[in-house]
């Protein structure tokens, strides 16, 4: 089981407009302590939108 202090935890990325959780990825907590935000394609909206790390 993954520890809560894991260096590379799994995170989900949610679309900022429609709030659907479309992507699962990993991030390095030491390099990116803040919330991750990427511009990715949202299949629900049909366009490229900003996706933020959700809890």
Curated annotation (Swiss-Prot):
Pfam families: Ribosomal_L33 (PF00471). GO terms for molecular function: structural constituent of ribosome. One of its GO terms (cellular component) is ribosome. The keyword Ribosomal protein applies. It comes from the Bacteria. One of its GO terms (biological process) is translation. Keywords: Ribonucleoprotein, Ribosomal protein. HAMAP family: Ribosomal_bL33 (MF_00294). Belongs to the bacterial ribosomal protein bL33 family. PANTHER family: 50S RIBOSOMAL PROTEIN L33, CHLOROPLASTIC, LARGE RIBOSOMAL SUBUNIT PROTEIN BL33C. This is Large ribosomal subunit protein bL33A. It comes from Mycobacterium sp. (strain KMS).
């Amino acid at each position: 089981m993954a520890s809560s202090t894991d260096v590379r935890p799994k995170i989900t990325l949610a679309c900022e407009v429609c709030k659907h959780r479309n992507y699962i990825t990993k991030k390095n907590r030491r390099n990116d302590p803040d919330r991750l935000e990427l511009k990715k394609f949202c299949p629900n909206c049909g366009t490229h939108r900003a996706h933020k790390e959700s809890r």
